[in-house]
């Protein structure tokens, strides 16, 4: 618990006090935000606001994670490093996208196809590493089961009984599944990052959930020798849950400090550098804590935002009419006359409710297992 609190404290301190330096630096080198031309008119004043603030979040989170472990003499575990791999990898994809926007002087960076391809180049190696990297007992960090609050009975490895073709099919399905989770997550968070502080605030709730989940899984882990007999049937076969909880706490703290400068009116934006990184970290945590489908609830706001875009496009293609005044959903409410800060705070409340529901479902699964 002390390591978790330290990680939060380090994260807050780093971003709260160093972000002003990066604001001045990014403004000096011309890393300013470009606004989509078809967006709400009131967003025009945001043009030129320093962007790529995600660099601050990523660096602060990683430093805070290592410092928290160092001060308490804890060893860094492969589970945390695997999350960092996805965190940094997706951040690099976002950074490339942001750099192209700055150079083109336009809000369009990487095309959708190239963005997904690069995201997959990060997600697929991550999926392979979760099996190749094992703990001291020789157990991999992931499984081929689709998970909710723990692994379900849906297991791709069941195809192994079909021979070589079955083994090949199982691996292909597993890689596609992990890729779907990762790519969907990073793009959903990126879509949500359209108003000052919206994505950062919503992700704070999601990271809080993974702090709680990791901490609980650590106390109820199958590897613990002191586990009460009545809890053995409920234990979690998760590698390094406390390490992931510490990393989630570091990200949470970094987001809290960053939000001080990112809230309306924003002094700096996280850009795709931050949005893709956060989506990648959340996806990695859901995979390694075996809570893949529960992530749909924990990150419910991101699902709604991404869903609004999909619905808008699909409905327009079929009926040549729009469901929303504009997508993503937060822009719809802006055009309905809601103030930006009103939309953000109300969406934060929704994100918090989804997180509470998700944690409740997670605990209920343990209670009634």
Curated annotation (Swiss-Prot):
* Reported function: Catalyzes the initial step of the lipid cycle reactions in the biosynthesis of the cell wall peptidoglycan: transfers peptidoglycan precursor phospho-MurNAc-pentapeptide from UDP-MurNAc-pentapeptide onto the lipid carrier undecaprenyl phosphate, yielding undecaprenyl-pyrophosphoryl-MurNAc-pentapeptide, known as lipid I.
Q: Which UniProt keywords apply?
A: Cell cycle, Cell division, Cell membrane, Cell shape, Cell wall biogenesis/degradation, Magnesium, Membrane, Metal-binding, Peptidoglycan synthesis, Transferase, Transmembrane, Transmembrane helix
InterPro entries under this entry?
Answer: Glycosyl_transferase_4, PNAcMuramoyl-5peptid_Trfase, PNAcMuramoyl-5peptid_Trfase_CS
What does it catalyze? UDP-N-acetyl-alpha-D-muramoyl-L-alanyl-gamma-D-glutamyl-meso-2,6-diaminopimeloyl-D-alanyl-D-alanine + di-trans,octa-cis-undecaprenyl phosphate = di-trans,octa-cis-undecaprenyl diphospho-N-acetyl-alpha-D-muramoyl-L-alanyl-D-glutamyl-meso-2,6-diaminopimeloyl-D-alanyl-D-alanine + UMP
Question: Where is it localised?
Answer: Cell membrane
Does the UniProt entry include the keyword Membrane?
A: yes
Q: What is this protein called?
A: Phospho-N-acetylmuramoyl-pentapeptide-transferase
One Pfam family this sequence matches: Glycos_transf_4
Q: Which HAMAP family match?
A: MraY
Q: Does the keyword DNA-binding apply?
A: no
Per its Swiss-Prot or TrEMBL entry, what cofactor is needed? Mg(2+)
């Amino acid at each position: 618990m002390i390591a978790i609190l330290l990680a939060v404290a380090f994260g807050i301190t780093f971003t709260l006090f160093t972000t002003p330096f990066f604001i001045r630096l990014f403004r000096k080198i011309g890393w300013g935000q470009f606004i989509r031309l078809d967006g709400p008119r009131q967003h025009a004043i945001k043009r030129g606001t320093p962007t790529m603030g995600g660099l601050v979040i990523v660096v602060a989170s990683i430093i805070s994670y290592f410092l928290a472990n160092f001060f308490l003499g804890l060893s860094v575990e492969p589970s945390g490093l695997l999350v960092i791999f996805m965190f940094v990898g997706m951040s690099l994809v976002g950074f490339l996208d942001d750099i192209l926007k700055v150079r083109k002087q336009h809000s369009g960076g990487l095309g959708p196809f190239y963005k997904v391809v690069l995201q997959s180049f990060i997600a697929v190696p991550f999926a392979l590493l979760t099996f190749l990297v094992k703990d001291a007992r020789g157990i991999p960090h992931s499984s081929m089961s689709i998970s909710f609050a723990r692994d379900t009975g849906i297991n791709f490895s069941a195809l192994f009984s079909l021979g070589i073709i079955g083994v090949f099919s199982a691996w292909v399905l597993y890689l596609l599944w992990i890729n779907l989770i990762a790519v969907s997550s990073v793009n959903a968070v990126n879509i949500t990052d359209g108003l000052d502080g919206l994505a950062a605030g919503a992700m704070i709730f999601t990271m809080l959930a993974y702090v709680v989940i990791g901490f609980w899984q650590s106390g109820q882990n199958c590897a613990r020798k002191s586990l009460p007999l009545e809890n053995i049937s409920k234990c979690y076969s998760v590698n390094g849950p406390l390490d992931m909880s510490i990393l989630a706490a570091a990200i949470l703290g970094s987001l809290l400090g960053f939000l001080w400068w990112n809230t309306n009116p924003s002094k700096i934006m996280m850009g795709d550098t931050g949005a893709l990184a956060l989506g990648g970290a959340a996806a990695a945590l859901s995979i390694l804590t075996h809570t893949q489908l529960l992530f749909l609830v924990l990150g419910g706001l991101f699902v709604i935002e991404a869903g609004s875009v999909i619905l808008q496009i699909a409905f327009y293609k079929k009926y040549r009419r729009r469901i929303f005044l504009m997508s993503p959903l937060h822009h719809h409410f802006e055009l309905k006359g809601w103030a930006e800060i009103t939309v953000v705070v109300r969406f934060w409340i929704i994100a918090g409710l989804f997180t509470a529901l998700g944690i409740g479902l997670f605990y209920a699964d343990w209670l009634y297992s």
